[in-house]
């Protein structure tokens, strides 16, 4: 239980946002296989808690980006909206047609779920 709490505290203290949470799979003849195992229902509960905290941290991070500038690599354009990622791998959309592969400087103006909205500066 303490190791789980420590993991949760690390996520909070370090403001981690891109988490890859998955249950451990026992492998025969490994030191971990000989350790006491956590029941599956507890594993699922802990994974859910960690994912929720990661999502909360991500929403807070994205909210804090509003008003900041970013560098965006345009990955695709759909119906005059350019989509890409920032230098920090956050999703950004700009309501303008920008050539795929272009790198543009933009200002973050809003967010919706996990996508930041921006305009070119």
Predicted regions located by residue number:
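Terminal RNA-binding accessory module
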Residues: 25-26, 33-121
């Amino acid at each position: 239980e303490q190791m789980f709490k420590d993991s949760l505290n690390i996520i909070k203290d370090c403001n981690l946002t891109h988490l890859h949470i998955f249950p451990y799979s026992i492998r025969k003849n490994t030191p971990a296989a000989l350790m006491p195992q956590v029941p599956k229902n507890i594993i699922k509960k802990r994974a859910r808690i960690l994912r929720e905290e990661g999502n909360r941290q991500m929403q807070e991070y994205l909210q804090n980006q509003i008003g900041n500038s970013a560098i965006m690599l345009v990955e695709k354009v759909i119906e005059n909206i350019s989509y890409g990622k920032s230098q920090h791998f956050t999703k950004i959309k700009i309501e303008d047609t920008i050539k795929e592969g272009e790198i543009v400087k933009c200002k973050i103006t809003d967010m919706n779920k996990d996508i930041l909205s921006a305009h070119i500066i």
